[in-house]
Amino acid sequence: MAFCIYVCFLLCYIVQVLTKAEGENHMTSAQIIIVVTIVLYLAAMVFVGVYFGKKGSGSSSDDFYLGGRKMGPVVTAMSAEASDMSSYLLMGLPGLAYLCGLPEVTWTAIGLAIGTYLNWLIVARRLRRYSAKLGAITIPDFFARRFGDKKHLLSCIAAVVILIFFIPYTASGFKAIGTLFNSLFGVEYHTAMIVGGIVVVLYTVMGGFMAVSFTDLIQSIFMTIALIVIVCFGVQQAGGLDTVIDNASALPGYLNMTQGYDAATGTASTYSALSIVSTLAWGLGYFGMPHIVLRFMAIREEKELNQSRRIATIWVVISMFIAVCIGVIGYSVSAAGKVPFLTTSAESETIIIKLADLMSRHGVLLAVMAGIILSGILAATMSTADSQLLAAASSVSQDLMQHSFGMKMNQRTTMLAARATVIGIALIGMVLAWDPNSSVFRVVSFAWAGFGAAFGPVMLFSLFWKRANKQGALAGMITGGAVVFIWKYLIAPMGGAWAIYELLPAFLAACIAIVIVSLATPAPEKAVTDTFDEICGK
């Protein structure tokens, strides 16, 4: 099966290249090297899926969704952060920095770094302990068991929220795959997107959580190599670090943390304190990301979370710093005439692809490195898409079909339902990603807000407030998700102080809803509060 996929991939690529415009009728040696490197990388990913599938990692629901809670600290840390740092790490962040300068992208990165650390510090330990005690293997299942929701209304709503926001999130990943091959080789966008999606689905359905987590570890290594190599090459091509700084300084507001550069007008724009708070609010999203917090539940030993936290935080800080630098460096490479100026959001998000293409023209070794860099972009996309597909599959087969709808399924039927869900959501994601001009950063931003507001407050209150009840949790979840849509499409367009990132007001509204509704309704049952005291202390 894997061999057939790679043959199809190469055939699609060759057909597209050979039917391109005149003057580009043959693959160059550099392009062949890059394709071989990427195909070997994809082969390695499928091999991991086959390996863990044969080991039985996808044979039971507990193994398929949570790896049997056997994850070591390094794999847990890197899997969590690789699944977090989707295509926006190697496309969204550099693209925004290239186009608009430091303010928005840097404050966003700072918020994400703080959010990462706090998530590991205050959520990880209690969630690992609590979920193990309750026997929960998904986030919706944890909410239902934590609040004693025997009717599983909470898990049903949570599963619907996951589907609503994961589908566009996954679509942004498939869009990145299509953009990669279209920008570099001229491969038809939709063909590349479909083939890349097939590979992601293949190793996800075969190996489950363990395959996803170990491929995430491998992919985080590729992402790191890509970032380091491209920043060094970019500085050299731009004419040195001094040239990079001079070029950036010449643009009004480009390096100013309280202004910003308006690429459309070539002038500085104000970046207010409200805007800074708004972008820092990205960090709030971590508390509600199902595909990230699931890693906390899967670690082998609770005591190993401290090591995981240190590894994860260091990697996130370094990788985002380099990603922002690449955007700034990329502008100077354009100024030097080495790559074209990129004037739109969709174009600027291809800056790393353009730099890798430039690198591939400087000999065999650098062509191989370019292939590794482009594999890193695939890694950033695939490491998030696979985790999201797995989380969505668990929501449908476990939380909706079995818990909410009461369907009785044996182990084999459960696994078939999970794998069918992975395929179905991937197909819907590809349909939504059909437009090649959509922005990765903006799509991820909206989905991030949805999860952060709908799940983040509920997660925090479930772990730290004994009085929170199922009515309050339900109110918070619905309020958070609804306010994201309302603020994004009705309030933010009013401009001014209203044009803040929708996650912040939605998160606050959800917190208020949880407190008010919990206090206005009966206290949780004694069994629920006794479990809370046992796990979290009185």
Predicted regions and their residues:
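Membrane-embedded helix-loop-helix hairpins and adjacent transmembrane boundary segments
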Residues: 13-16, 23, 27-538
